[in-house]
């Protein structure tokens, strides 16, 4: 593939790591963010110390605080902004974009209020004549590992397989490998909903529970994710792949995961407001829990773990009490997880 001009919208940890991958592959990378000081740091010092203290970026990676300049003559746009601002940024893109491009996103969440997936938001806000089918880039990936070029395998999903193959081509190299998929709903919901389970897994650790309990929440959490995803139109098999169980394992077991760390702090008795302030980064699992709980209620899907985490986050339920409530639920067969509502 010829070198591409790619705008990466969002200078957070994952946006920065993906920018480096694309730069390593010979593409012209333009990072866009709305903090002029952060953009100046990337351009002048080739660092992004808010997220990576000891990483020096290639000087060819350029940063912009003007969206119109970042998008000038680009071949592709990669959204890596928090879910809560995706619609706003997409509207801004639609206002200044002058030509058709590939649209990809690597964000994980559901929009509060509408409960919509990221790709749906992008489809609604960016006119069809300016884009192809949206590509979702998602899977088991810690930015802290990708930025040091540790081996990472994830999925690229689009309703148009050629668009997924485009993402595969621009990203894949010796340490970063993409597999294509056409189940956009499955890949997106898996990436969003696993953050909820990661909060729960962290809470178990903070409460002092052992590996048995952590394995249980991951596997039963996967059952919940699959139930809701299938009700939304996803393929069940997707949840056994990289974007499903793979992402759930890496997010639900690692201190690199901000969602896991948030849950751990909750389990140790810290208040959510203090946790969010101390972390200084978006904890997608918190807002996604609310959206998923409301969506499950709307669709009539049984999600006891999600419901419990919702009550801990939004109704001040004691975390240990919530766990005991789950353990006291009526017993049932394990494999009722897809069709049982």
Curated annotation (Swiss-Prot):
One of the GO BP terms on file: phospholipid biosynthetic process
- Would the keyword Nuclease turn up in this protein's UniProt record? no
The metabolic or biological pathway listed in the UniProt record of this protein is:
Membrane lipid metabolism; glycerophospholipid metabolism
Any one Gene Ontology molecular-function term assigned to this protein's record: glycerol-3-phosphate dehydrogenase [NAD(P)+] activity
Summarizing the function annotation, the protein's role is: Catalyzes the reduction of the glycolytic intermediate dihydroxyacetone phosphate (DHAP) to sn-glycerol 3-phosphate (G3P), the key precursor for phospholipid synthesis.
Family membership: Belongs to the NAD-dependent glycerol-3-phosphate dehydrogenase family.
Q: What is this protein called?
A: Glycerol-3-phosphate dehydrogenase [NAD(P)+]
Q: Which organism is it from?
A: Lactococcus lactis subsp. lactis (strain IL1403)
């Amino acid at each position: 593939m010829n070198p591409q001009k790619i705008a990466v919208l969002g200078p957070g940890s994952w946006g920065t790591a993906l920018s480096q991958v694309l730069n390593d592959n010979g593409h012209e990378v333009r990072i866009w963010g709305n903090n002029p000081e952060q953009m100046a740091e990337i351009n002048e010092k080739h660092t992004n110390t808010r997220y990576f203290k000891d990483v020096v970026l290639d000087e060819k990676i350029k940063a912009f605080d003007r969206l119109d300049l970042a998008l000038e003559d680009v071949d592709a746009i990669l959204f890596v902004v928090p879910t809560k601002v995706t619609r706003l940024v997409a509207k801004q893109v639609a206002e200044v974009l002058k030509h058709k491009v590939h649209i990809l996103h690597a964000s994980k969440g559901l929009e509060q209020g509408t409960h919509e997936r990221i790709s749906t938001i992008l489809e609604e806000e960016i006119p069809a004549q300016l884009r192809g089918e949206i590509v979702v880039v998602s899977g088991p990936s810690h930015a802290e590992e990708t930025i040091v070029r540790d081996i990472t395998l994830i999925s690229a999903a689009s309703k148009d397989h050629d668009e997924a193959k485009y993402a595969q081509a621009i990203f894949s190299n010796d340490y970063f490998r993409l597999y294509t998929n056409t189940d956009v709903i499955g890949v997106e919901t898996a990436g969003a909903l696993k953050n909820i389970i990661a909060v729960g897994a962290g809470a178990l650790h903070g409460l002092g529970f052992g590996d048995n309990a952590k394995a249980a929440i991951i596997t039963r959490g996967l059952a919940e994710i699959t139930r809701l995803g299938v009700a939304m139109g996803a393929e069940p098999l997707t949840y056994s792949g990289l974007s499903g169980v793979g992402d759930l394992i890496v997010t639900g077991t690692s201190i690199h995961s901000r969602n896991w760390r948030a849950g751990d702090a909750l389990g140790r008795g810290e208040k959510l407001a203090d946790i969010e302030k101390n972390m200084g980064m978006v904890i997608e699992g918190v807002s996604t829990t609310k959206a998923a709980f409301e969506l499950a209620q709307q669709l009539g899907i049984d999600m006891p773990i999600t419901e419990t985490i919702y009550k801990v986050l939004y109704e001040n339920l004691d975390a240990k009490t919530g766990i005991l409530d789950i353990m006291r639920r009526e017993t049932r067969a394990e494999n009722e997880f897809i069709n049982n509502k």
